[in-house]
Amino acid sequence: MNDYTKYTIGVLSLQGAVSEHIAQIETLGAKAIAVKSLSELQQVDALVLPGGESTAMRRLMHSSGLFQALKSFDKPILGTCAGLILLANKLEGGEPPHLAKMNIQVQRNAFGRQVDSFQTDLMIKGFADPFPAVFIRAPYISRIGSEVEVLAEWQGNVVFAKQGNLLACAFHPELTSDTRVVELFLQQLKE
């Protein structure tokens, strides 16, 4: 197992399953902190953008003074569900992009409403066994740029991708006991 004890990972703490992300990160040995301010953001080696409602999260990023700092944050980022939407440089339906850090186009709520949430065994590139992916009002990636690597698809739709030190998944890895997605994210710190 890798040693992540020297790293501090932030979890943007505006909405979403913050405590669940923190628990998974700490399970792997890294220090995890909730990020609500610029001073907290400046302490971290990497950042998780959790699920939530992306438009509300954008408003909260602006009101907290974090928006511009997040746009220029150049360390590893894992975006889950709404975090994926925040990372996209294009959103279907004409909505303006949020942080626009990844060359991807995203369809919001692509798998239906809250009642249509589901869990499925997902084959992820580099994983020997399927990952128990939890999809809740999940988006999917409808277009990728040439520099984006597809890590997983479900029913022909891209649901996990990588661009440089950015990982974006449509599902919620923090809602399972399987830490492989978070470990893949933490491995970005060693590259």
Curated annotation (Swiss-Prot):
Gene3D superfamilies: 3.40.50.880
Binding site for L-glutamine: 52-54, 108, 136-137
Full protein name: Pyridoxal 5'-phosphate synthase subunit PdxT
Quaternary structure note: In the presence of PdxS, forms a dodecamer of heterodimers. Only shows activity in the heterodimer.
EC number per UniProt: 4.3.3.6, 3.5.1.2
GO cellular component, one term: glutaminase complex
Function: Catalyzes the hydrolysis of glutamine to glutamate and ammonia as part of the biosynthesis of pyridoxal 5'-phosphate. The resulting ammonia molecule is channeled to the active site of PdxS.
Pathway as given in its UniProt record: Cofactor biosynthesis; pyridoxal 5'-phosphate biosynthesis
Database matches in Pfam families: SNO
Similarity field: Belongs to the glutaminase PdxT/SNO family.
Gene Ontology MF terms: glutaminase activity; pyridoxal 5'-phosphate synthase (glutamine hydrolysing) activity
One biological process term in Gene Ontology: glutamine catabolic process
Catalysed transformations (reactions): aldehydo-D-ribose 5-phosphate + D-glyceraldehyde 3-phosphate + L-glutamine = pyridoxal 5'-phosphate + L-glutamate + phosphate + 3 H2O + H(+); L-glutamine + H2O = L-glutamate + NH4(+)
This protein's UniProt keywords: Glutamine amidotransferase, Hydrolase, Lyase, Pyridoxal phosphate
Active-site residues, record numbering mapped to chain: 81, 172, 174
